[in-house]
């Protein structure tokens, strides 16, 4: 039978293997997106051109061949699809590099500070829990499958694969933001490099990962519309309504989750709501062009057009309000703690006020802007705690 130390060594090596596997999957996804964008690489079609609004969808046996007028389902513009998929792949690769950096730093610091094996495992889970790494690899592989299916114009299968990908992506974001351990505070205090990775870098990665979920909410809603359009004999405007409803519900759920749950771990979280705002704008642009081109095929859809615009406008206003609310609450939380983050914010505000006074009243020298002010005098100079609680097992 293996002892506790052998079991901990096996767990540590298994975690390293997961990190390497996730990094390989993320790198493969990025390379697939690059190669799929090059005509000479042998892909039959460009994957991002899902809905061709310039030609009719007259596929033999397709659902729209049984209609007097034919039209493709609502989807994002080609540059938008490319940007959203590229952003998601970049986020997954960034998370993989973050995990690799965490493994390197943790291995070095564990030898230098003689951490106990259990502390090393706790710290590894704080950087990236094993379940998080597995979900990240599944996100990369499923999105790669989506790209290959879209390149071969298998719209229904691609839509089903993307829905699966979004489920993994949402779980990946939730696990990364919340899952960890609170038993490594002594190790983080003793090792500033480990603290920079497991706390500060983790907060940045949390922002972009949840931002990718916000963009994916729009894509998964439209993919559901494509799946419905290719599977059932239903009206075009119903698929557009279904896509809008799914996107709205998922976007609202994400913003509520960020504000209620994730804000307990990291306060500065503007990226998820900002990405929802970007996704709403992209959805609105695609819907406007779609309704304008296929108004005749859609029939009496004036109410649908107005309703779509109204819902997207309200969702955009909510996302904008959530950005402001999150930043204000973050400043209040850091001010109450007396952290360096709020000291820097206060210093920037003081500098801007002095600059405006100088320009408006025409007095003072530029050196006055560099004079020490109250912005950083009354706050603690110690490291701020970005993650107030490091999560739960």
From Swiss-Prot:
Regions that span the bilayer: 15-35, 84-104, 131-151, 155-175, 208-228, 242-262, 265-285, 304-324
Annotated membrane topology: Multi-pass membrane protein
Subcellular locations according to the entry: Virion membrane; Host Golgi apparatus, Host trans-Golgi network; Host endosome membrane; Host nucleus inner membrane
GO cellular component, one term: membrane
Keywords: Disulfide bond, Glycoprotein, Host endosome, Host Golgi apparatus, Host membrane, Host nucleus, Membrane, Transmembrane, Transmembrane helix, Viral envelope protein, Virion
Intravirion-side segments: 1-14, 105-130, 176-207, 263-264, 325-393
GO biological process, one term: virion assembly
Record-linked Pfam families: Herpes_glycop
Virion surface side: 36-83, 152-154, 229-241, 286-303
Similarity remark: Belongs to the herpesviridae glycoprotein M family.
Role summary: Envelope glycoprotein important for virion assembly and egress. Plays a role in the correct incorporation of gH-gL into virion membrane. Directs the glycoprotein N (gN) to the host trans-Golgi network.
Subunit comment: Interacts (via N-terminus) with gN (via N-terminus). The gM-gN heterodimer forms the gCII complex.
Name this polypeptide is given: Envelope glycoprotein M
Organism encoding this protein: Suid herpesvirus 1 (SuHV-1)
Gene: gM
């Amino acid at each position: 039978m293996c002892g506790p130390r052998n079991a901990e060594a096996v767990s540590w090596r298994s975690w390293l293997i997961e990190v390497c596997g996730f990094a390989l999957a993320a790198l493969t996804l990025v390379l697939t997106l690059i190669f799929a964008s090059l005509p000479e690489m042998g892909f039959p079609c460009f994957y991002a051109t899902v809905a061709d609004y310039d030609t009719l969808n007259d596929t033999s046996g397709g659902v729209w061949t049984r209609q007097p007028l034919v039209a493709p389902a609502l989807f994002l513009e080609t540059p938008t699809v490319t940007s959203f998929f590229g952003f998601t792949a970049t986020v997954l690769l960034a998370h993989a590099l973050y995990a690799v950096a965490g493994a390197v730093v943790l291995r070095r610091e564990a030898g230098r500070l003689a951490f106990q094996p259990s502390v090393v495992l706790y710290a590894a889970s704080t950087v990236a829990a094993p379940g998080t790494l597995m979900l990240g690899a599944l996100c990369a592989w499923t999105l790669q499958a989506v790209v290959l299916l879209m390149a071969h114009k298998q719209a229904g299968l691609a839509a089903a694969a993307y829905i699966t990908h979004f489920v993994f992506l949402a779980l990946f974001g939730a696990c990364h933001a919340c899952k960890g351990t609170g038993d490594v505070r002594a190790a983080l205090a003793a090792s500033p490099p480990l603290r920079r990775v497991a706390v500060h870098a983790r907060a940045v990665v949390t922002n972009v990962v949840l931002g990718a979920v916000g963009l994916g909410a729009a894509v998964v809603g439209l993919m559901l519309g494509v799946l419905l359009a290719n599977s059932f004999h239903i009206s075009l405007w119903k698929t557009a309504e279904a896509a809008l409803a799914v996107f709205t519900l998922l976007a609202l759920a994400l913003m509520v989750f960020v504000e209620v749950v994730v804000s307990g771990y990291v306060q500065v979280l503007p990226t998820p709501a900002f990405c929802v705002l970007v996704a709403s704008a992209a959805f609105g642009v695609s819907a406007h062009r779609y309704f304008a081109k296929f108004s005749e095929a859609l029939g009496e859809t004036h109410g649908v057009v107005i309703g779509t615009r109204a819902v997207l406008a309200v969702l955009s206003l909510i996302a904008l309000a959530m950005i402001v609310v999150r930043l204000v609450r973050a400043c209040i939380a850091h001010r109450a703690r007396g952290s360096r983050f709020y000291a820097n914010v206060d210093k920037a505000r003081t500098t801007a006020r002095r600059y405006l006074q100088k320009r408006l009243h025409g007095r003072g020298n530029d050196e006055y802007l560099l004079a020490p002010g109250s912005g950083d005098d009354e706050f603690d100079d110690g490291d701020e705690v970005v993650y107030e609680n490091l999560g739960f097992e």
